Amino acid sequence: MTNRSKQKGTSFESSVLPAIKEKQPLAERRALEGKQDKGDFYIPGEDRFVIEAKNHKEMDLSGWLREATTEAANANVPHGVVFHKKRGTTDPREQYATMKVGTFLDLVYPEE
């Protein structure tokens, strides 16, 4: 990954963080941990999912979901979600979130 790619990723993560903080004020970006990454954001008390953020011109949804799933396992949580850049807008709430249908159902309808 080039420095330019890292800069784009960091910029995207930083742009999305305020939207997350609206709901979870103590959320923060995580430091990179190599193969032991646990998602791109730390959200205190969140034990259901991690978020992997992507800002690429070409989409690789299956690859990104695989990475998010691996990082969820590293964080000992059941689900990985991908936030990815929507071209043509910088509004953090207009970016995309991708997950498996099972993840969506588990998050929307959690077991009691």
Q: What is each of the regions a protein language model found here?
A:
Residues 1-112:
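Catalytic phosphate/metal-binding cores of nucleic-acid and nucleotide-processing enzymes, i.e., regions
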